[in-house]
Design a protein with these regions (language model features):
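Conserved structural-core and active-site-/substrate-pathway-adjacent residues in large, well-folded domains
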Residues: 48, 88-90, 121, 246, ...
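Conserved catalytic core of two-metal-ion nucleotidyltransferases
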Residues: 19-31, 37-54, 58, 62-64, ...
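Glycine- and acidic
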Residues: 32-41, 94-104, 226-232, 273-275
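Conserved nucleotidyltransferase catalytic core and NTase-mimicking acidic/glycine-rich helix/loop elements
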Residues: 68-69, 180-294
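Active-site nucleotide-donor binding segment shared across nucleotidyl transfer reactions
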Residues: 48-106
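Tandem CBS (Bateman) regulatory domains
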Residues: 1-18, 22-26
Length: 294
């Protein structure tokens, strides 16, 4: 994996697609060699990070970007480093601006760059997000002040859309650029989510999370979904999501800035009465589901 990562760091634009195929192949080998689900998904995510960083760097070299600080951020499973072999894009862009007028001016420059990154990532196998949660969308290419205000509104005015957005955007990790810009958002989240005014938001998030239940019927039988002649269980929706949602809520409540589920449980779990054995058992169950999903 380290040798492949070194190839990615030195890659040209024309090399990226072939290297992405190698990452997919290596990911399958991880699963076949008996890696745990957690380790295999982390390894795939680590290599995907390297690919994405290289694409962003190459696009930045070819663009005439302004002097303003900026940061490309991963969201969702990419931020949590819990990606499987098939993944789509969830990303955003943060930049600094002195006021609203400058933010609009800078956005007009950053948007074409962000859209080119999204296009090249798509060419490399990272499918465009069906919900358009990407930096090339004007809604997710924002100044730091705009992101701060947006996060504040979601926590203090928890409408249904805000709760949905929180499950994606509050799993945020800087990938490339001025990483401190993302740290500011993490600090604000920790400050706001730990306050009394955020309790309604956290309760609503918990209520929403409880709608995801294991696919077990009243008689204890497994409930499946149908796709043509085949029946299946959506492991992400009815399995992994339960762990991810719980860890997110616990981390927000405890002021833990980390995005990955394992670290969230390790750091925030004790505040919710989980001992070391509880945490390891929980993570082991999630890892087993991740391995099946690979």
């Amino acid at each position: 994996a380290r040798g492949l990562a070194q190839q990615i760091v030195a890659a040209s634009t024309g090399d990226i697609a072939a290297l992405s195929v190698q990452v997919q192949t290596m990911g399958r080998e991880f699963a076949e060699c008996g890696f745990s689900g957690a380790l295999a998904t982390y390894a795939v995510s680590w290599l995907n990070d390297a690919l994405s960083q290289r694409v962003v760097a190459l696009c930045a070299q070819g663009a005439r970007l302004p002097a303003a600080s900026w940061c490309w951020v991963n969201l969702g499973s990419a931020a949590r480093q819990e990606q499987t072999l098939t993944t789509d894009q969830d990303n955003g862009l943060i930049f600094t601006a002195s006021d609203e007028a400058e933010a609009e001016e800078l956005r007009s420059v950053f948007l074409p760059f962000a859209r080119e990154v999204n296009r090249q990532l798509s060419d490399a196998g990272f499918t465009l997000c069906p919900g358009d949660i990407m930096a090339g969308n004007i809604k997710w290419c924002r100044s730091l002040d705009e992101w701060v205000q947006l996060f504040y509104n979601w926590i203090h005015k928890p409408e249904p859309e805000a709760l949905l957005n929180a499950t994606i955007f509050f799993d945020l990790r800087p990938l490339y650029g001025d990483l401190d810009l993302a740290s500011v958002l993490h600090q604000k989240l920790a400050q706001w989510s730990g306050g009394s005014s955020a309790q309604i938001f956290l309760r609503l998030m918990a209520t929403n999370a409880l709608t995801a239940e294991p696919p077990i019927g009243f008689t204890g039988d497994i409930v499946t979904e149908k796709d043509g002649k085949d029946r299946f269980i959506d492991i992400k929706k009815f399995g992994i999501r339960i762990f991810v949602d719980a860890a997110r809520i616990m981390a927000l409540s405890a002021g833990v800035p980390d995005a990955d589920t394992r670290t969230r449980f390790l750091k925030a779990g004790p505040a919710f009465g989980m001992n070391e054995r509880d945490i390891e058992a929980t993570l082991g169950a999630m890892s087993a589901l991740q391995r099946i999903r690979l």
